[in-house]
Amino acid sequence: MKISATYFKQYIPLLLLIMISFSSKAQYFGQNKVRYKKLDFKVLQTPHFEIYYYLKNENMLKRFSQDAETWYKMHQEVFRDTFLTKNPIILYNNHPDFQQTTALQGEIGIGTGGVTEALKNRVIMPVMELNSQTRHVLGHELVHAFQYHVLLEKDSISLENVGKTPLWMVEGMAEYLSIGKKDAFTSMWMRDAMLNRDIPSLKDLTNSNKYFPYRYGQAFWTYIGSQYGDTTIVPLFKNTAKYGYENAIRYTFGYDDKTLSGLWKNSIDAHYKPMLKADSSQIKITGTKIIDNKNAGNMNVAPAISPDGKYVAFMSEKDLFGIDLFLADAKTGRIIRKLTSQISNGHIDDFNFIESAGAWSPDSKQFAFSIFSHGKNQMMIINVANGSTVSQTAMNQVQQFGNLTWSPNGKDVAFSGMVEGQSDIFSYNLDTKEITQITNDVYSDYAPSYSPDGKKIVFSSDRAAIQNKNINAALPINLAIYDISAKEVKNLDVFPGANNLNAQFSSDSQNIYFLSNRDGFRNLYKYNFDGNTVDQLTDYFTGISGITEFSPAISVSGTDDIVYSYYRYQRYTLYNAKLSSFKAKRIGNQEENFDAAILPPMENYGVNIINSNLNNFDRFEKIVADSMKTVA
């Protein structure tokens, strides 16, 4: 059975990639899957879909259904194809439920965001933590539904031929049609490739496992769509499935794949090289390198520095048997011990490591983090001194949660979690064992962090974008402050069109450090409450990043030591820097320029269907209630 998956958007060493989940080219092996609860699915019919759901959140279900129909209209303009029967979508309320699906055999890893079957053409996916993620995964998977429909049903191409289509073509096309050419995250990858003088040819993409197909495939299709027009995409894709990519390129463009590879490379160089400053300041890294591929792995992510600044906990594939949680000296990088491991700890089915980080207790003696165990996320707290488990706690109805933060008085742990497809901020009291829901609204609230004085919680949210009636397919992620005593949320009016994430308070609670792509790059910023001012602290050509754009990549100690994950050479390296080490530059709160986020070429020389539609996603006419009915 040929299937396609989305959202694990990052290259990691091949062994780990297979171990975690990369189902686009893989077969499932038919393992028996443990089910922890029975789900009572209903069926909602829309003009072009049958949505199998058990979600009780009617507003979320309505929005999902409307998005599915909008994606259908947008993809139909590109594929020029119509579904004669309603396409099935199986929707899970959260990722832990999705991992237990019986619609597919075999294990689904924490990194698989969605699956589309070739033969049944079913889309199987969960509601994601962020509204924009759910929308993107749905759009991505529906591209696969169109791909399979147009190849297998309309053109009668054999499943074997479809399976031979290069993965970078299949997945890259799904990324381009669901994200477009404005993507700061993929642009970071392309700048890294240019800087490393390692821009692959199409032959390299096809034959080597070195280049992650989602990112490079998206960049390739952006080039094709921008240079030759989006009307070229489907003919090239269909010809590739029929004749192979070399013959398809020659048939479509009149020259060979080597020539097209050269043209694509020249476009990348011409776009990004002028952005590289002559003084090399953008590749001079601030701080001390503490964790890299010499003392750990290639993927060293989710750093969390202890409040006293002595230790850093992080996730790494150091031992090549999967992702483990390690403890290191925050000053020297010396690995002290492995805190816990999925292999050695039978209570851990998986670490919630891709877009989540753990939290230290105020006394730096305990560490809390999110795991996947027995069909749901649970909070595990360990004693750092000896690695023993202090507690393991399920959060009742909050079956998916992550990005923990420990209150300065030591009594509460706050986190972002999902209930009925809605992402909010919660807190858990360690004494009373009670869960308090801090936010409760349609907005996606994500990655909270306590202020050291215990008065505020900062988090990321799409509330400002939704309140301002954003019409793009992508919803910008802005910063918000929760006043604990007043129980009020206030938006910070900083870089409104950017994604502003991973916010952390300074030790005096007067500043917030955060990551932003406000200029198309991914750098560290500091916001000051008193002056309502923003300083840019880094100016890197690649960027500070985790596995995905939404992954935690910075952590701040009680002494304002900042540990961050720097992306270069397709690897993640941890640095530790004092605040005084950064060269701060004052910039305007509204100062944005996304040229560096645009995948090349900058201009569209052909018919621009995809990006125009993505920029006007919410201007498409929405289906009304009369077009939706529950039939079972």
Sequence positions of predicted segments:
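Juxtacatalytic substrate-recognition/specificity segment
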Residues: A26-P166, A184-F185
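Beta/coil-rich, acidic/histidine-enriched accessory regions frequently appended to metallopeptidases
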Residues: N32-R35, F41-V43, S208, P235-K238, ...
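Active-site-proximal alpha-helical
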Residues: I51, H75, W168-D183, R191-D257
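A flexible loop/linker signature enriched in serine peptidases of the S9 family
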Residues: N295-N298, M315-F326, I343-F353, A368-M380, ...
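Blade-terminus and WD-like Trp-Asp/Gly-His loop motifs, strongest in beta-propeller folds
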Residues: P303-Y311, G358-Q366, N403-D412, P448-K456, ...
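Short loop/turn segments that connect beta-strands within beta-propeller blades
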Residues: A330-G333, N383-G387, N429-K433, D483-K487, ...
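Beta-propeller fold detector
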Residues: I335-Q342, V390-A394, T436-T439, K490-D493, ...
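Outer-membrane beta-barrel initiation region
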Residues: R586-A632
